[in-house]
Amino acid sequence: MLKVAKISVSCIVLVLCIYSLFNQNELLLIVVQLFVAALLSLVGVEAILSKQKLSEYLLFGSAAFLLVVNGVKFII
């Protein structure tokens, strides 16, 4: 189930990334970053299930960093 979710989120991110590059749309860039944060969270869950401690901290930390940066950017 996690593989299907990772593949589908990766495909959505790739399509949105290419589309946002052509249109220079700020909203699409934020959506892409949120999808990347979701993808990092999914991979982090997979790392938890396989008991890889360092990987899960890095992945969840990266996802949290993306979400915090987008939140601060939205507030400012």
Curated annotation (Swiss-Prot):
Q: What domain of life?
A: Bacteria
Q: Where in the cell is it found?
A: Cell membrane
| Any one of the GO CC terms | plasma membrane
Q: Does the UniProt entry include the keyword Membrane?
A: yes
Q: Which residues cross the membrane?
A: 2-22, 28-48, 56-76
Kindly state which keywords UniProt assigns to this record, in alphabetical order: Cell membrane, Membrane, Transmembrane, Transmembrane helix
Q: How does it sit in the membrane?
A: Multi-pass membrane protein
Write the protein's name: Uncharacterized membrane protein YoyI
Q: What is the lineage of its organism?
A: Bacteria, Bacillati, Bacillota, Bacilli, Bacillales
Q: Which gene encodes it?
A: yoyI
